[in-house]
Curated annotation (Swiss-Prot):
It catalyses: GTP + H2O = GDP + phosphate + H(+). Transmembrane segments: none annotated. Its EC number is 3.6.5.n1. It is found in: Cell inner membrane. One of its GO terms (molecular function) is GTPase activity. One of its GO terms (biological process) is positive regulation of translation. GTP binds at D19, H20, G21, K22, S23, T24, N136, K137, I138, D139. This is Elongation factor 4. It is a peripheral membrane protein. The keyword Cell membrane applies. Required for accurate and efficient protein synthesis under certain stress conditions. May act as a fidelity factor of the translation reaction, by catalyzing a one-codon backward translocation of tRNAs on improperly translocated ribosomes. Back-translocation proceeds from a post-translocation (POST) complex to a pre-translocation (PRE) complex, thus giving elongation factor G a second chance to translocate the tRNAs correctly. Binds to ribosomes in a GTP-dependent manner. It comes from Thermus thermophilus (strain ATCC 27634 / DSM 579 / HB8). Belongs to the TRAFAC class translation factor GTPase superfamily. Classic translation factor GTPase family. LepA subfamily. Pfam families: EFG_C (PF00679), GTP_EFTU (PF00009), GTP_EFTU_D2 (PF03144), LepA_C (PF06421).
Length: 610
């Protein structure tokens, strides 16, 4: 077997803000290294999910191996690990970054440095990587490459003269990028003779071969027939085959060695056995220490998912299990609701993640689902001294037992042109935000960096859309968790015909509870079909009703057959109708239709546009 020369390997990743042209640049790199023939080339080659290509975002990390003959005449092996760009997928990015030695930081020549660029940059710095700034999209008419290069130097401290000007669309400058990868990014270190130490940075599920973990080997080697052990669970498996990633798919090889990026098949049936971020080692010669710094992904947003047809409950469970194979951050547990039947309480990394999971369930598994309003995790300190976590607003303990409720806060970093600062500050004030820092950036395009702290729940719903509309699409944001703080929060129950609909319960700040409740009951009154009796819809905090709307009763015209005639006769018929309605009202049940749940999702969140 030919030994890989470590000095000829380069492992790198591309990081960028959403839409700065990362996937297009990756396409050009594949073309220039002749990894993909012109016939096979398609846009966003590495984005394998249909959804990724449709939305134009990268959701899962994926890897590819290409060879490049550099100007020095030597042939190098590049492992490119593509990373997601959206803030929800920060953990995926951190794992992909752990597997490489250097990164290309792509910045759009017309947009400049944006919030997520900054977040990703700090992550790469934490890993101690070599960072090559690439100013992309220089073919655009409104590109300002020099100015952006200076902005990169000012904001990120990367020397402007090291920046490479390129265009993923035309291919200009890509050759220069490939040379820079060879020159500037260090080769991997590692001893193939040492005990095996491999980091799992992703995994996919294959119906025939089970879970296929994607690995970066730091030490040792692995070949078919080896007995491997998963570090955190201690489970052992026998390797069937190992191999590398080519743009055409997975290709088996004889062995993988330190410094390489590849995959293995070992008949692993349960995804929980290979958590992303775990270390794989040999059963008979384990490595003394696993790869550091990994924590299981922690969901921060929870929502209930219920099948429209209750018969699909089992199908939904299987679908969630399958998605979890590829998505370490997704959690779910069964829950039941009087209004919606049986479903699951699912945990996500953020709203985009929740949306994508729901869309994949509906698309790939043909399910139709109802999602309840997403909520964050509250911590409740009880008078007894214990602390409980609340994932579902309906589970909030009785107010008499509560000492205080803590809500999660986030630290927001917002980049915006100067003229929108006023309206953005107004929006953030509305969302109970607190200004921490404000920073004017150099350059002709007067841009400002705002740093705010705000309750996560306020940012959850329509904040991103409102941010974009207030700033005409120019502002960008990134957030990170900033711990818990006490808040004046109340649980609001929604009652339809005197019965609490648990799926509509929400937790809100006391000042905002009335406005949100009002919007929700009005919306429900519009969408709940009229019954033969009057249906009151109420919102209550504890025993106190704070908002009410009524769905008027449908009335049959009982006087239609009385032509003229005595008034007492008419009265008798009307009284009889009234009696019947009273009886109906006492025993009548109101079905809350599906649209009602969907309507409520939008209702309580549309606060008056400032």
């Amino acid at each position: 077997m030919v030994r890989m020369d470590l000095s000829r390997i380069r492992n790198f990743s591309i990081i960028a803000h959403v839409d700065h042209g990362k996937s297009t640049l990756a396409d050009r790199i594949l073309e220039l290294t002749h990894a993909v023939s012109d016939r096979e080339m398609r846009e966003q080659f590495l984005d394998s999910l249909e959804l990724e290509r449709e939305r134009g975002i990268t959701i899962k990390a994926s890897a590819v191996r290409v060879t490049y003959r550099a100007k020095d005449g030597e042939e190098y092996v590049f492992h490119l690990i593509d990373t997601p760009g959206h803030v929800d997928f920060t953990y995926e990015v951190s794992r992909a970054l752990a597997a490489v030695e250097g990164v290309l930081l792509v910045v759009d020549a017309s947009q400049g440095v944006e919030a997520e660029t900054l977040a990703k940059f700090y992550m790469a710095l934490e890993h101690g990587h070599v960072i090559i700034p690439v100013i992309n999209k220089i073919d655009l008419p409104n590109a300002r490459p020099l100015e952006v290069a200076l902005e990169v130097e000012e904001v990120l401290g990367l020397p402007a003269d090291e920046a490479i000007f390129a265009s993923g669309k035309t291919g200009e400058g890509v050759e220069e990028i490939l040379e820079a990868i060879v020159q500037r990014i260090p080769p991997p270190k590692g001893d193939p003779e040492a005990p095996l130490k491999a980091l799992i940075f992703d995994s996919v599920y294959d119906a025939y071969q089970g879970v296929i973990p994607y690995l970066r080997l730091f030490e040792g080697r692995v070949r078919p027939g080896d007995r491997i052990r998963i570090y955190s669970t201690g489970k052992e498996f026998t390797v069937d085959k190992v191999g590398v990633f080519t743009p055409q798919g997975l290709v088996a090889t004889e062995a993988l060695e330190a410094g390489e990026v590849g995959w293995l098949v070992a008949a692993i049936r349960d995804i929980h056995d290979v958590q992303v971020g775990d270390t794989i080692t040999l059963a008979d010669r384990p490595t003394p220490s696993p790869y550091p710094g990994f924590r299981p992904a922690k969901p921060v947003v929870f929502a209930g998912l219920y099948p429209v047809d209750s018969g699909d409950y089992g199908k939904l469970r299987d679908a969630l299990e399958k998605l979890k194979l590829n998505d370490a951050a997704l959690t779910f547990e069964p829950e039941s609701s009087t209004a919606l039947g049986f479903g699951f309480r699912c945990g996500f990394l953020g709203l985009l993640h929740a949306e994508i999971v729901q869309e994949r369930l509906e698309r790939e598994f043909g399910l139709s689902l109802i999602a309840t309003a997403p909520s964050v995790v509250y911590k409740v300190r009880l008078k007894s001294g214990e602390e409980v976590e609340v994932h579902n607003p309906a589970d909030l303990p009785d107010p008499t037992r509560i000492e205080e409720i803590l809500e999660p806060y986030v630290k927001l970093t917002i980049f915006t042109p100067e003229e929108y600062v006023g309206s953005l500050m107004q929006l953030l004030q509305e969302k109970r935000g607190r200004l921490v820092n404000m920073n004017y950036l150099p350059g002709a395009q007067k841009r400002v960096e705002l740093v705010y702290e705000a309750p996560f729940a306020e940012i959850l719903y329509d904040f991103h859309d409102r941010l974009k509309s207030v700033s005409r699409g120019y502002a960008s944001m990134d957030y990170e968790q900033a711990g818990y703080r006490p808040g004046d929060l109340v649980k609001v129950n929604v009652l339809v015909h005197g019965e609490v609909v648990d799926a509509l319960t929400f937790i809100a700040h006391r000042e905002k509870a009335y406005t949100m409740a009002r919007a929700i009951v009005d919306k429900l009154a519009e969408v709940i079909p009229r019954q033969l009796f009057e249906v009151p819809i109420q919102a209550a905090i504890g025993g106190k009703i704070i908002a009410r709307a009524t769905v008027k009763a449908l009335r049959k015209d009982v006087l239609a057959k009385c032509y003229g005639g005595d008034v007492t006769r008419k009265k008798k018929l009307l009284e009889k109708q009234k009696e019947g309605k009273k009886r109906l009202k006492a025993i009548g049940k109101v079905e809350v239709p599906q649209e009602a749940f969907l309507a409520v999702l939008s209702a309580g969140r549309d606060e008056p546009k400032g």
